């Protein structure tokens, strides 16, 4: 009698979307996350070996890793970082950050980066976005990642491995937020020059209301826009994975009510 084998990670197939990994956090089990981390490590190593352009970290395959404010994101990011380090990659640890900041910092190194985030999804959802040699994955790339994943035997990390994953520390790029702000300032200057205008954000400070929706931008938005010359009124500007005001999704009209009332 033939027995049908179903891989332990078959339930996780639904996480692999068109352009990222995303779904209910209960599917991000320890054995799945650890196996996925090892697959990502292999992908990043291969990306370095086959890169067509030289990297700033010469002869040092590098990956930039960050995470959002969701409760499980830091833990998942640590799994990713540990597997990458064990594979010989240099991990540039951004900690709590935003996806654009991760992408910017990846560009400063080898073009390889990973962000544990579910963007504007509900709090019980988590996910992963990534860059390989400066490019986001295609739908085929995402599915190939899953095919590589099911080639791994599901191994539940033991206590020793989990302790190592949680306790290992990594290099954080020096002054990376200041570097990010400087790049945005240069972009604003270029835009103003292109418009041939005498009025820049430095000459005409304006008031701006920013609703961080308790996401990762809470740690960065005020500093960024203040540097650009704005007087900031901050709403919900503390990272909180419970998202007490509701889903961090600005496309939901009810999530803009507080912002609209403050602007008035």
Where are these regions (language model features)?
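Generic structural signal for short, solvent-exposed loop/turn connectors between secondary structure elements
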Residues: 23-29, 104-112, 154
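Gly/Ser/Thr-enriched, mixed-charge loops and adjacent short helices
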Residues: 5, 126-263
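Gly/Ser/Thr-rich beta-alpha loop segments that engage phosphate groups in nucleotides
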Residues: 22-25, 68, 97, 129, ...
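N-terminal small/polar loop signature for handling phosphorylated ligands or for N-terminal nucleophile
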Residues: 50-55, 62-125, 224-264
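An N-terminal, well-structured beta->alpha segment
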Residues: 1-80, 86-87, 169-208
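Glycine-rich, flexible loop/turn motifs
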Residues: 11-17, 21, 124-127, 141, ...
